[in-house]
Swiss-Prot record:
Keywords: Ribonucleoprotein, Ribosomal protein, RNA-binding, rRNA-binding. InterPro entries: Ribosomal_bL20 (IPR005813), RIBOSOMAL_L20_CS (IPR049946), Ribosomal_protein_bL20_C (IPR035566). It comes from the Bacteria. SUPFAM superfamilies: Ribosomal protein L20. Binds directly to 23S ribosomal RNA and is necessary for the in vitro assembly process of the 50S ribosomal subunit. It is not involved in the protein synthesizing functions of that subunit. It comes from Lacticaseibacillus paracasei (strain ATCC 334 / BCRC 17002 / CCUG 31169 / CIP 107868 / KCTC 3260 / NRRL B-441). GO terms for cellular component: ribonucleoprotein complex; ribosome. Belongs to the bacterial ribosomal protein bL20 family. Gene3D superfamilies: 6.10.160.10, Ribosomal protein L20 (1.10.1900.20). Disulfide bonds: none annotated. This is Large ribosomal subunit protein bL20. The lineage of its organism: Bacteria, Bacillati, Bacillota, Bacilli, Lactobacillales. GO terms for molecular function: rRNA binding; structural constituent of ribosome. One of its GO terms (biological process) is ribosomal large subunit assembly.
Amino acid sequence: MPRVKGGTVTRKRRKKVLKLAKGYRGAKHLLFKAANAQVMVSYRYAFRDRRAKKRDFRRLWIARINAAARMNDISYSKLMHGLKVANVDMNRKMLADLAVSDPDGFKAVADTAKKALA
């Protein structure tokens, strides 16, 4: 039997990796071995950062809510507790968006929390 080197399969696989490595600097977008190593690292970064993104956005929302709450003379923790007591079911993403896009609406929400705590 003749020896099979898998030319078309190998070329297709290498071409796919080099396509994924487009935009990388130096040999990492030209040479298969370097490109393959960098693509593997990039996959690890992407996996890690998909999880970190959730934490980062939550931190951003909390910072925005806290800033808007303090402009309405209430701390973040008291605002959240007041909303829980008042049975206002708004998540942090919605509150942060409200704080940025509609300060008057956020003021009404903050007043609701204050009344629930009083």
